[in-house]
Amino acid sequence: MELLCCEVDPMRRALPDPNLLYDDRVLHNLLTIEERYLPQCSYFKCVQKDIQPFMRRMVATWMLEVCEEQKCEEEVFPLAMNYLDRFLAVVPTRKCHLQLLGAVCMFLASKLKETIPLTAEKLCIYTDNSIKPQELLEWELVVLGKLKWNLAAVTPHDFIEHILRKLPLPKDKLVLIRKHAQTFIALCATDFNFAMYPPSMIATGSVGAAICGLQLDDGDRSLSGDSLTDFLAKITSTDVDCLKACQEQIESVLVSNLRQVRQQQQQSNPSKTIEELDQASTPTDVRDINL
């Protein structure tokens, strides 16, 4: 009799390093270097002639879907979008090459963040084989050259743990807060309006939006309204008014995305009620966010 073993070894992960998380010098260094990895300009105005903002959103949505389907680490998608924005800020690109560029950026980001990175062949399949593996590998060298091999970019995810550990949060809610903040960060990466924002501001605004959405301010005044905003602003040395504006913009993006999802679902299933659609189809990590 043959035995079929269906057990899967869990992904081995390093334990949190207190020498990194509890040393304020690490946070200070991240804040010092984060702007080095921002796009040099608002490239739709002065660099790109063939590519429009809606095209970036389309390729970003496709990249996010690929990363989710492949169960990539949370950091892969925002890092790939950082590469894409920095490349587009210096190289005029034809719209027919935009998906190829997105695939290359995911290829590079997964090499940096994944234990088992995405393969060129698999990424080509996700483009319906509109590009070839050799073409992707050739573009990989082009992108590396234009980015000057500076791939270890600072992203909002680098700040999440530093922010969470300084807040008086209930331990049983940390996983949920972290998941919601990661969802907000991914949404921000799909929207070009956030491309020029420092990663620390996006991270701080995402954590603030997550805490407000989960309504964790019932028993602790430091987690409510302006008190929370002031506290978060001090952690990352962010201007309070800028942080408020960023958080409001993040919440607005979420509301807009939820509305768009519902409209698409109603068009495809006109006989179902909104409540039925919410229960059946809306992604869990988005539905659980309460504004």
From Swiss-Prot:
Function: Regulatory component of the cyclin D2-CDK4 (DC) complex that phosphorylates and inhibits members of the retinoblastoma (RB) protein family including RB1 and regulates the cell-cycle during G(1)/S transition. Phosphorylation of RB1 allows dissociation of the transcription factor E2F from the RB/E2F complex and the subsequent transcription of E2F target genes which are responsible for the progression through the G(1) phase. Hypophosphorylates RB1 in early G(1) phase. Cyclin D-CDK4 complexes are major integrators of various mitogenenic and antimitogenic signals.
InterPro entries: Cyclin, Cyclin-like_dom, Cyclin-like_sf, Cyclin_C-dom, Cyclin_N, Cyclins_cyclin-box
Keyword terms, alphabetized: Cell cycle, Cell division, Cyclin, Cytoplasm, Membrane, Nucleus, Phosphoprotein, Ubl conjugation
Subcellular location: Nucleus; Cytoplasm; Nucleus membrane
Organism for this UniProt entry: Gallus gallus
SUPFAM superfamilies given in the database record: Cyclin-like
GO biological process: cell division; G1/S transition of mitotic cell cycle; positive regulation of G1/S transition of mitotic cell cycle
Protein name: G1/S-specific cyclin-D2
Oligomer status and interactors: Interacts with the CDK4 and CDK6 protein kinases to form a serine/threonine kinase holoenzyme complex. The cyclin subunit imparts substrate specificity to the complex.
Modification note: Phosphorylation at Thr-282 by MAP kinases is required for ubiquitination and degradation by the DCX(AMBRA1) complex. Ubiquitinated by the DCX(AMBRA1) complex during the transition from G1 to S cell phase, leading to its degradation: ubiquitination is dependent on Thr-282 phosphorylation. The DCX(AMBRA1) complex represents the major regulator of CCND2 stability during the G1/S transition.
PTM annotation (Phosphothreonine): residues: 282
Record bears the keyword Cytoplasm: yes
Any GO molecular function: cyclin-dependent protein serine/threonine kinase regulator activity
Region (Disordered): 264-291
Database matches in Pfam families: Cyclin_C, Cyclin_N
Family the entry assigns: Belongs to the cyclin family. Cyclin D subfamily.
GO terms for cellular component: cyclin-dependent protein kinase holoenzyme complex; cytoplasm; microtubule organizing center; nuclear membrane; nucleus
UniProt keyword Hydrolase, yes or no: no
